[in-house]
């Protein structure tokens, strides 16, 4: 559905040259929700705007539905953009128009026949849950309701792709959840492909199928959301995930325990089974759970536990090997009183 290849965007001023997007490549499959995470200045917005060519890449290609947008003329690009909706952090509603009027305006601007507009507006109002607000003005709406109007306008031309530029960052946590639930519903019911950018890993955890981390214009890590949460590689990815799922124990706390310290990761249904207790009993190893929980990512359980193991060294090694055989990952943080380098 979306394929970016070696995208680079350079901003030039009289005094300097700034690389906003640095040789980025990624793919988003049809019907996927793809989240791009990064701090301010990481290049997220620049990259998102390259997808529909609001920002024209300095080099590289971007294909949407098989079309290389970088090679289209002005008229062809305008037509292609009709199938790419976009919502923003700020709502950009017309204050003098009602909710109905704001959505109708988007349809009129797209060239939809006047006699077809009312029915389409009603359809969109129903879709985003604002049928009872059709005659309200923006000043009478909450932030979440304003964003729903923005989503309705973005869907006016029945796009196959929706780009979300920090769409929930101005909303409170409860409203954010409701907007994310709406986006998930649109993805499932309409088969809508969604690319969203955010600095909140919780947003990605809530609704995304795949994700990427951006830093200094580069995409430093990407993959299935579940896999990235289970085994983050880049330090920045670990930092972001730590904001949502914290499994870090301070060194001064660990120093109070003399046994082998291990982190055990269970994926899928294995996370819900009593493998650890069964194993410890089988190998006569004593276990002390220091920290842990089972998180649900995309409906799939991910269990991460940090524990102290005490017993004969050979028995501990055998227990760890057995746990690994039972579809778990084990990282020995410290072997007895000797810290691993």
UniProtKB/Swiss-Prot annotation:
Topology in membrane: Peripheral membrane protein
SMART domains to which the protein is assigned, alphabetical: AAA, NIL
Gene3D superfamilies reported in the protein's UniProt record: 3.30.70.260, P-loop containing nucleotide triphosphate hydrolases (3.40.50.300)
Start and end residues of each ABC transporter domain: 2-241
Enzyme class label: translocase
Coiled-coil stretches: none
Residues annotated for ATP binding in this entry: 38-45
Catalytic activity: L-methionine(out) + ATP + H2O = L-methionine(in) + ADP + phosphate + H(+); D-methionine(out) + ATP + H2O = D-methionine(in) + ADP + phosphate + H(+)
Signal peptide positions on this chain: none
Pfam families listed in its UniProt record: ABC_tran, NIL
Regions that span the bilayer: none
Cellular compartments annotated: Cell membrane
Disulfide bonds: none
Gene Ontology CC terms, in alphabetical order: plasma membrane
Enzyme Commission number(s) of this protein: 7.4.2.11
Major subcellular location class: membrane
Domain of life: Bacteria
This protein's UniProt keywords: Amino-acid transport, ATP-binding, Cell membrane, Membrane, Nucleotide-binding, Translocase, Transport
InterPro entries in the record: AAA+_ATPase, ABC_transporter-like_ATP-bd, ABC_transporter-like_CS, ACT-like_dom_sf, MetN_ABC, MetN_ABC_transporter-like, NIL_domain, P-loop_NTPase
Gene Ontology MF terms in the entry: ABC-type D-methionine transporter activity; ATP binding; ATP hydrolysis activity
Its job: Part of the ABC transporter complex MetNIQ involved in methionine import. Responsible for energy coupling to the transport system.
Quaternary context: The complex is composed of two ATP-binding proteins (MetN), two transmembrane proteins (MetI) and a solute-binding protein (MetQ).
Family: Belongs to the ABC transporter superfamily. Methionine importer (TC 3.A.1.24) family.
Protein name: Methionine import ATP-binding protein MetN 2
Originating organism: Shouchella clausii (strain KSM-K16)
Phylogenetic placement of the source organism: Bacteria, Bacillati, Bacillota, Bacilli, Bacillales
